[in-house]
């Protein structure tokens, strides 16, 4: 297994009337091309739907494709949403998503207790994703340094 030092939280940047299942994100990512190379598929390891359902993306043993410079040593978790009806980037998590994200992050923390839990914007300041402060939200799970 890879050495995991980060658990990175993302949003899928869709409006309330749009969906983003793991299968849909997989298709979107396969359509992307970087430096002339097509992406292999979904870059996240998990997707948390609005109803709290957790869908599997990439296998945990495989590096993600969700945060430039950090994929080899991180787990990527994406929640469905992140945009309001007007397209503004805001925290749109449902109570079911908040609960499911918490449970999933706690589970990942048991597997990778030394991993920092961060939002995408903590590693790439030009991003607002995931539209909430993941470091603060999961402060009780952060490793003691």
Task: Annotate each PLM feature.
Residues 1-12, 50-54, 70-75, 80-145:
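Basic/polar, cationic surfaces and motifs that engage anionic cell-wall
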Residues 61-68:
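Short amphipathic alpha-helices and their capping/turn segments at secondary-structure boundaries
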Residues 1-61:
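Short, conserved "active-site rim" segments that organize catalytic pockets and cofactor/ligand binding
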């Amino acid at each position: 297994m890879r050495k995991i030092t980060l658990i990175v939280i993302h949003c899928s940047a869709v409006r309330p009337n749009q969906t983003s299942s793991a299968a849909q994100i997989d298709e979107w990512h396969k359509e992307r091309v970087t430096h002339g190379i097509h992406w292999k598929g979904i870059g996240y390891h998990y997707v948390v739907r609005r109803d709290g359902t957790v869908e599997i993306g990439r296998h945990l043993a495989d590096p993600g494709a969700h945060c430039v410079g950090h994929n080899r040593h991180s787990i990527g978790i994406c929640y469905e949403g992140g945009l309001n009806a007007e397209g503004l980037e805001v925290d749109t998590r449902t109570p079911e998503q908040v609960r499911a994200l918490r449970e999933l992050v706690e589970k990942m923390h048991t597997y990778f207790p030394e991993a920092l839990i961060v939002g995408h914007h903590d590693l790439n300041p030009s991003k607002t994703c995931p539209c909430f402060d993941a470091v603060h939200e999961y402060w009780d799970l952060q490793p003691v340094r």
